[in-house]
């Protein structure tokens, strides 16, 4: 299961959806696409406004500068991940700390 912790300015993502075999998992692909697209958009707007870390265990996205457009993109990312969790509750769990 993918476990996502969401707070006001930070998102942490861990795990694997286990929806299908590695390389064929549409839920993992959806999470990856949503996160990569959103982070790239935020970095394009203000490369110093977001901290993005992707290591073997966790993906972490944190808003570090107050920027209206970055905040909108970040909030959109949170909503997309919550929607995916609603659609695939056995594979994605969102814990909100807001």
Could you tell me what each predicted segment is?
Residues 1-26, 33-36, 40-98:
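N-terminal intrinsically disordered, cationic/polar leader segments
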């Amino acid at each position: 299961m993918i476990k996502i912790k969401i707070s006001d300015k930070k998102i942490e993502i861990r795990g694997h959806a286990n929806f299908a075999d590695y390389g064929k998992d549409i839920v993992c692909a959806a999470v990856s696409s949503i996160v990569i697209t959103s982070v790239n958009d935020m970095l394009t707007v203000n490369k110093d406004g977001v901290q993005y870390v992707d290591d073997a265990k966790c993906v972490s996205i944190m808003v570090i500068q107050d920027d209206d457009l970055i905040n909108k993109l970040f909030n959109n990312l949170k909503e997309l991940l919550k929607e995916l969790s609603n659609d695939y509750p056995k594979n994605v769990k969102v814990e909100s700390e807001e």
